[in-house]
Amino acid sequence: MERREEQLGAAGAGAAPALDFTVENVEKALHQLYYDPNIDNKNLAQKWLMQAQVSPQAWHFSWQLLQPDKVPEIQYFGASALHIKISRYWSDIPTDQYESLKAQLFTQITRFASGSKIVLTRLCVALASLALSMMPDAWPCAVADMVRLFQAEDSPVDSQGRCLALLELLTVLPEEFQTSRLPQYRKGLVRTSLAVECGTVFPLLEQLLQQPSSPSCVRQKVLKCFSSWVQLEVPLQDCEALIQAAFAALQDSELFDSSVEAIVNAISQPDAQRYVNTLLKLIPLVLGLQEQLRQAVQNGDMETSHGICRIAVALGENHSRALLDQVEHWQSFLALVNMIMFCTGIPGHYPVNETTSSLTLTFWYTLQDDILSFEAEKQAVYQQVYRPVYFQLVDVLLHKAQFPSDEEYGFWSSDEKEQFRIYRVDISDTLMYVYEMLGAELLSNLYDKLGRLLTSSEEPYSWQHTEALLYGFQSIAETIDVNYSDVVPGLIGLIPRISISNVQLADTVMFTIGALSEWLADHPVMINSVLPLVLHALGNPELSVSSVSTLKKICRECKYDLPPYAANIVAVSQDVLMKQIHKTSQCMWLMQALGFLLSALQVEEILKNLHSLISPYIQQLEKLAEEIPNPSNKLAIVHILGLLSNLFTTLDVSHHEDDHEGPELRKLPVPQGPNPVVVVLQQVFQLIQKVLSKWLNDAQVVEAVCAIFEKSVKTLLDDFAPMVPQLCEMLGRMYSTVPQASALDLTRQLVHIFAHEPAHFPPIEALFLLVTSVTLSLFQQGPRDHPDIVDSFMQLLAQALKRKPDLFLCERLDVKAVFQCAVLALKFPEAPTVKASCGFFTELLPRCGEIESVGKVVQEDGRMLLIAVLEAIGGQASRSLMDCFADILFALNKHCFSLLSMWIKEALQPPGFPSARLSPEQKDTFSQQILRERVNKRRVKEMVKEFTLLCRGLHGTDYTADY
């Protein structure tokens, strides 16, 4: 091996000095890794060992570490080092060393066949990697050779040991192929070669599996080996005998799990649907498992029922279309569907008593999609067969969605309750999907059941049953337009009759009412049937989320019909807010609900309600403004400001939100005079300034203040105009004292909405110049500590160029400094900041011709920008940002072509720039490609992606598969 070590001197260059990587030092480091209690020492040892594994010396010490006198941990490291050297540094191995390396690995595997299993596996993986690298040319019959060598009678190892070692090697070979870093063209060749080798492997596996004398450990290994090989997309018909043998092995409890895995992997191969005859032969085999399934369910054997269900679902889900097409076999497929239905409705509560039913849900989606994809005539036939099945499915799902008894539920862990919640969401999604198949009849079916349940005097009904039926309604109504359903009026009439004695039932009642809010908007006469229930529930903290979200939906959808109820809604809401019944987020939702509600009232009514609603908070804020800042009063201030901003988010008397709803919407006339929100903001403006003066250094408070105005601006649009001058002045003072990103975001909103209006341009221009000047000063002090400010600043600049380029005409704006700061921002590690900076340049470069100062700066400093872009593409920036940098290159090419053609050649001339991996020819090709493409932005993005892969040494590797 010394010879190989000399020849492979290049491998692992850059690791620690060669003398360090001796057998003795590796053993010491391993001892430190496994037994040293100090975590820092462990980490150091691990880092050193990783360097050792890739060093040239690994070829020497790895074989010595495999000596029989070493402990398994040390032997395992030696085997792993061999695998790493073979798989990652194959090109460093001289071709004349292949055979001796192969022979030594065979020798070691034979020796470890009766030794440590974990070491044996690593050695098998190393030999598998070697085989994949040599196939097909240097080792054309690799698998046949492996089988022949391990069947040799002259081996010192007993036949069972040899057999298990061979099976381990054959098992890891396809697994290593799946994870190997072979180039794409080699992968295709090796896959073809392995497919041919199936002819050697499968007969051997069949023989071992069917041989009565084969011990259980061998048969289990055979099943695992088969499971590994079928993932190479072996034709299903070639697997037929082994699949049948695996079905037979399901009766053996020791082989059950391995058999399930093998069968599921074989059935699930994408190519399997081509072999319909084989699939049809599998249906009776699956149906033959029904008695075993029933016995497992009866005995509470969750593992067995889970495994059999996986097999049935794998066949049904992967091949429903192919099997539906076999019309003459419709009864056997229907039997399979009914078997899966049994699995869906398996007795017990998920996830405590069973975990099987959740496996089946996607099958029902797939089957429905396949039925509905047939042409009309064929679809009608299948609808006739499968509509009753889907009605049965609805009953089964609603039964599975039922809560357990209160006593039983009380014993569930929080994790089990969360899993059950997610399971119910999955059932809800399935019901919503099934509606497409069953239509309005499904709602009628649910309504009839609920009606019978609530009106029957014969026997008391369980709340769980009622809740599940309502949950079914809610699932459908949340996403499907039920406005034309003739059962909803009856449902609304039934809801008040429900005896609510349980939180889960009350929650579902609330969510169901919320899901029907659009229907209530079309049938306002029914609002009074359910609104009292919602207002009553507001006072119950356990119903916080459901009651508040339902009230918000009703206020949003039905606001034009709520004025008669407004006083009551406001009074109840005020009461629960004052009593602090709800958590912060629900308080914010409640304020949004009240904003929707007030929007539909007359201005005088709005002002009156606003006064009574927010006066207590204004008084509290006045008191807090006098106090010395501390953490508790900060929370109170942020809470009050949040309530105000959420109220103003939805309080829209001009009904901008409704503009997209269509002409038929009932709108109130737009009121004349000042907007109520503006009136309130002007009244509290001084108070907000007072609060700010004490909290300017606190980003959270500043953010909360800015949020009030930002949300108001977004809602009010032009109605906000009277506030623009004083808000600009306040923002300027705020930002000059303590720069915060939220102030820049609000400035961006003002630029977006008001900068184009001559009356508002002067204060906005003054604010824009001020925040730009302050931010440029920040860059001089060191902007790396403020990526959020830089991000918001870049977005503001881009918005200014997009909305009002005149802002860049002012002589007081230092365009050169802005340009240089933006180039600096391109080098930030934070992706959002880089993205925002790229966005600025893509807005700036098209202005070269129309804004003189911009044209001048680009001419003087554009080369600096190009170099920054090339550095980023060369590897300095994340690959996910390459499209953004491509946009800059495209803009440079489109708007500064003559300059770019000169700069790009100069910039790419220095050797090693932007990457040492590039040849001069590759750089020249890239520059020519870019300069040629001035129309198709998508092509430029593709060029940049290709170039960055070359720069990073990733071109043609597996790393680029998803790129």
Curated annotation (Swiss-Prot):
Q: Which UniProt keywords apply?
A: Cytoplasm, Nucleus, Protein transport, Repeat, Transport
A GO-annotated cellular component: nucleus
HEAT repeat positions: 24-54, 56-88, 95-135, 142-179, 194-231, 236-268, 276-325, 330-372, 375-438, 440-476, 487-522, 524-558, 562-600, 603-648, 676-716, 720-754, 761-803, 815-845, 860-893, 897-931
Q: Which Gene3D superfamilies match?
A: Leucine-rich Repeat Variant
The highest taxon in the source lineage is Eukaryota
Which SMART domains does the entry mention?
IBN_N
Task: Identify the Pfam families for this entry.
Answer: IBN_N, Importin_rep, Importin_rep_2, Importin_rep_3, TPR_TNPO3_IPO13_2nd, TPR_TNPO3_IPO13_3rd, TPR_TNPO3_IPO13_4th, Xpo1
Q: Which SUPFAM superfamilies match?
A: ARM repeat
Which BP terms from GO are recorded? Answer: protein import into nucleus
Q: What are the recorded GO MF terms, alphabetically?
A: small GTPase binding
Locations listed in the record: Cytoplasm; Nucleus
Matching InterPro entries, A to Z?
ARM-like, ARM-type_fold, Exportin-1/Importin-b-like, Importin-beta_N, Importin_beta-like_NTR, Importin_rep_1, Importin_rep_2, Importin_rep_3
Q: What residue stretches are annotated with the Importin N-terminal domain? A: 45-111
Q: How does it assemble?
A: Interacts with UBC9, RAN, RBM8A, eIF-1A and PAX6.
Q: What family does the Swiss-Prot or TrEMBL record give for this protein?
A: Belongs to the importin beta family.
Functional summary from the UniProt entry: Functions in nuclear protein import as nuclear transport receptor. Serves as receptor for nuclear localization signals (NLS) in cargo substrates. Is thought to mediate docking of the importin/substrate complex to the nuclear pore complex (NPC) through binding to nucleoporin and the complex is subsequently translocated through the pore by an energy requiring, Ran-dependent mechanism. At the nucleoplasmic side of the NPC, Ran binds to the importin, the importin/substrate complex dissociates and importin is re-exported from the nucleus to the cytoplasm where GTP hydrolysis releases Ran.
Spell out the protein name for this chain.
Importin-13
Q: Which organism is it from?
A: Mus musculus
Encoding gene (name): Ipo13
